C-alpha cells in the first residue's frame, strides 16, 4: 500500500495519522479507503454543480424564435436583477409547450427565464415613476428563475411613447390611438393568457370606490432614498437594492415617530415582529397613510405602552439631569452663604424691606459713596459731579488769566526799561510778585529841557 495519500494531507493532519498508523499498522488501509472516498465524493459534487450551473442552463436554452413568441416589447431598460437593455418576451417552450417569461438579448438568447408562471409569479404590477410622466415601471416578483440564477424581482423601465409606436407598428392598436392605457390593457390580457395577472392601481380609468386607494410617497430607508408605494394588497419600497415587498396582510401594526413640522417617520411591524423604519416622509402625506392604515385595519401602535415607557424613561432621565443641576446650584448657594457674606449682608433675600439702610461701594467710576434711598440719588450725584468739574474748570481758567496778566505786566516793564523808564518790581501792589533782574540804579543828569510829568522819576 503506497503512502502517497499521506503526502497530500496537511502537515498537522499527516503527523496525527502517521502516529496512529505506527501505533496500529492495520489502520493504514482504513485511512486509505477514507481518503479515496472523500476524493470521489468531491469530484461528483463538482460534476453536479457543473451540470446544474445557471449560466450553462440559460446558455443551453434555445433562442426564442418568432414562431413561439406570444408578445414582445423590445429595448426596455432592465434595472433588476441585471442592468442592461433587453427584450421582454412572453413565449411558448418548444419542449414543454408551456408559457415562459424571458428577458432576451438582440439575438434571442435567454438571459433570465421564469417558468410555471401561474405558480412562480407572486405579484406583478405597473407603477408610476415620480416626477416622470412619460416613464413607468413594470414590477414582477417571482419565487425563482430557471436554474435559480436570479431571485431578485424584475424591475423594468418602459417609455410610454416608444410602446405606443411599437404597438402601432405591429398592428396591436389602431394608428389613431394616443391613449397609453390601451397598451396597458393589452399587456394585462396577454399576462392573463399565460397564467398570471398584472395589477394596474394607478393607470386604470376605472377605480372601485370601495377599494383601498393607491399612492406613493418619498422617504428614506437608512441612508438610501427611495419611493414607498402603498398598493391595495402590497407595500413596496424601492428601487435601490434590496427592494422591499410586503403583503398588506402581513403588516401587524404601524407607528409614527420623529414627528416635526415638516417630516415624520413610519415604522412597519410585521407579524413575525420584524421592524422596517422609513424616515423623512413629508407631513402632507400623513393623511393618506393614516387613511390607508385604517382601511387595511392595521393597528396604530404609536401610543402603545412600550413606546410610552420609552418616552417616560427619556423624560425621567431628563428630569434626573435637571434635578442634579438644581442640586449643584443649591450647594453652590449654601457655600456662598457660609463664605461670601459681606458686612453680614444676607444673600438669601432680595427684599428691600429686609435690607434696611446700608451703604455699599458705588458702581460709579470715582468710587464715591452714595445712599441708596431712591432712584433719584444717582441723578443728584451726577449733577454734583458736573458742578464740581465746572468749578474746577473755572478756577483753572482764572488762574490762567491771572498768570497771563502777570506775564503782560512783565513784558510791559521790560519795554519801559528799554525806553529808560524805571519799574519797581518790589511794589507790594503787584500781588507779591517780585523779580530780581540784577539791574543797578544809574544816576541820570537833569537837563533844563526836562519837565515834570515826563513819566520818569528821579531819586
UniProtKB/Swiss-Prot annotation:
Q: Name one GO cellular component term.
A: nucleus
Has UniProt tagged this entry with the keyword Nucleus? yes
Q: Which UniProt keywords apply?
A: Chaperone, Chromosome, DNA-binding, Nucleus, Transcription, Transcription regulation
Matching InterPro entries: PH-like_dom_sf, RTT106/SPT16-like_middle_dom, RTT106/SSRP1_HistChap/FACT, Rtt106_N, Rtt106_N_sf, Rtt106_PH
Cite the Pfam families for this sequence: PH_18, Rtt106_N, Rttp106-like_middle
Q: List the disulfide bonds.
A: none
Q: Where is the composition biased (Acidic residues)?
A: 347-398
Tell me the SUPFAM superfamilies matching this sequence: PH domain-like
- Which GO MF terms are attached to this record? DNA binding; histone binding; nucleosome binding
Tell me where it resides: Nucleus; Chromosome
- Tell me which SMART domains the record gives: Rtt106
Query: The organism sits in which domain of life?
Result: Eukaryota
Q: Where is the composition biased (Basic and acidic residues)?
A: 399-421
Write the signal peptide boundaries.
none
- Please list where the region (Disordered) is annotated: 304-324, 343-437
Is Transcription regulation included in the keywords of this UniProt record? yes
What role does it play?
Answer: Histones H3 and H4 chaperone involved in the nucleosome formation and heterochromatin silencing. Required for the deposition of H3K56ac-carrying H3-H4 complex onto newly-replicated DNA. Plays a role in the transcriptional regulation of the cell-cycle dependent histone genes by creating a repressive structure at the core histone gene promoter.
Subunit organization? Interacts with histones H3 and H4.
Q: Which PANTHER family match?
A: FACT COMPLEX SUBUNIT SSRP1, HISTONE CHAPERONE RTT106
Family affiliation: Belongs to the RTT106 family.
Name under which the protein is recorded: Histone chaperone RTT106
UniProt organism field: Vanderwaltozyma polyspora (strain ATCC 22028 / DSM 70294 / BCRC 21397 / CBS 2163 / NBRC 10782 / NRRL Y-8283 / UCD 57-17)
Q: Which gene encodes it?
A: RTT106
Amino acid at each position: 500500500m503506497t503512502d502517497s495519500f499521506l503526502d497530500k494531507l496537511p502537515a498537522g493532519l499527516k503527523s496525527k495519522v502517521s502516529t496512529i498508523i505506527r501505533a496500529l499498522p492495520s489502520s493504514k488501509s482504513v485511512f486509505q479507503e477514507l481518503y479515496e472516498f472523500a476524493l470521489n465524493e468531491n469530484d461528483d459534487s463538482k460534476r453536479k454543480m457543473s451540470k446544474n450551473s445557471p449560466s450553462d442552463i440559460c446558455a443551453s436554452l434555445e433562442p426564442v424564435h418568432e414562431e413561439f413568441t406570444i408578445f414582445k416589447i423590445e429595448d426596455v431598460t432592465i434595472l433588476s436583477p441585471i442592468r442592461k437593455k433587453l427584450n421582454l418576451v412572453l413565449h411558448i417552450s418548444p419542449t414543454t409547450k408551456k408559457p415562459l417569461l424571458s428577458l432576451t438579448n438582440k439575438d434571442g438568447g435567454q438571459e433570465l427565464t421564469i417558468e410555471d408562471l401561474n405558480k412562480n409569479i407572486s405579484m406583478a404590477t405597473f407603477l408610476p415613476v415620480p416626477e416622470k410622466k412619460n416613464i413607468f415601471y413594470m414590477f414582477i416578483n417571482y419565487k425563482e428563475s430557471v436554474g435559480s440564477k436570479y431571485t431578485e424581482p424584475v424591475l423594468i423601465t418602459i417609455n410610454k411613447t416608444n410602446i405606443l409606436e411599437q404597438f402601432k407598428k405591429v398592428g396591436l392598436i389602431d394608428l389613431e390611438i394616443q391613449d397609453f392605457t390601451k397598451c396597458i390593457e393589452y399587456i394585462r390580457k396577454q399576462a392573463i393568457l399565460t397564467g398570471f395577472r398584472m395589477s394596474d392601481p394607478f393607470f386604470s380609468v376605472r377605480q372601485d370606490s370601495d377599494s383601498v386607494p393607491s399612492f406613493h410617497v418619498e422617504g428614506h430607508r437608512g441612508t438610501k432614498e427611495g419611493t414607498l408605494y402603498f398598493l391595495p394588497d402590497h407595500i413596496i419600497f424601492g428601487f435601490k437594492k434590496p427592494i422591499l415587498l410586503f403583503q398588506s396582510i402581513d403588516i401587524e401594526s404601524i407607528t409614527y415617530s420623529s414627528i416635526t413640522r415638516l417630516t415624520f417617520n413610519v415604522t412597519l411591524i410585521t407579524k413575525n415582529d420584524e421592524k422596517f423604519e422609513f424616515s423623512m416622509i413629508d407631513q402632507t402625506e400623513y393623511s393618506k397613510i393614516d387613511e390607508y392604515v385604517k382601511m387595511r385595519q392595521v393597528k396604530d401602535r404609536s401610543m402603545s405602552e412600550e413606546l410610552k415607557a420609552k418616552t417616560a424613561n427619556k423624560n425621567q432621565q431628563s428630569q434626573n439631569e435637571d434635578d442634579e443641576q438644581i442640586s449643584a446650584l443649591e450647594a453652590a448657594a449654601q457655600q456662598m452663604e457660609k463664605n461670601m457674606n459681606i458686612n453680614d449682608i444676607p444673600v438669601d433675600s432680595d427684599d428691600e424691606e429686609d435690607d434696611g439702610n446700608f451703604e455699599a461701594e458705588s458702581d460709579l467710576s470715582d468710587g464715591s459713596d452714595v445712599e441708596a434711598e431712591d432712584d433719584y440719588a444717582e441723578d443728584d450725584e451726577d449733577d454734583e459731579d458736573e458742578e464740581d468739574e465746572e468749578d474746577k474748570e473755572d478756577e483753572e481758567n482764572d488762574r490762567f488769566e491771572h498768570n497771563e496778566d502777570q506775564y503782560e505786566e512783565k513784558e510791559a516793564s521790560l519795554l519801559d526799561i528799554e525806553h529808560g523808564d524805571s519799574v519797581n518790581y518790589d511794589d507790594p501792589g503787584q500781588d507779591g510778585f517780585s523779580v530780581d533782574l540784577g539791574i543797578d540804579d544809574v544816576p541820570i543828569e537833569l537837563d533844563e529841557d526836562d519837565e515834570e510829568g515826563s513819566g520818569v522819576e528821579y531819586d
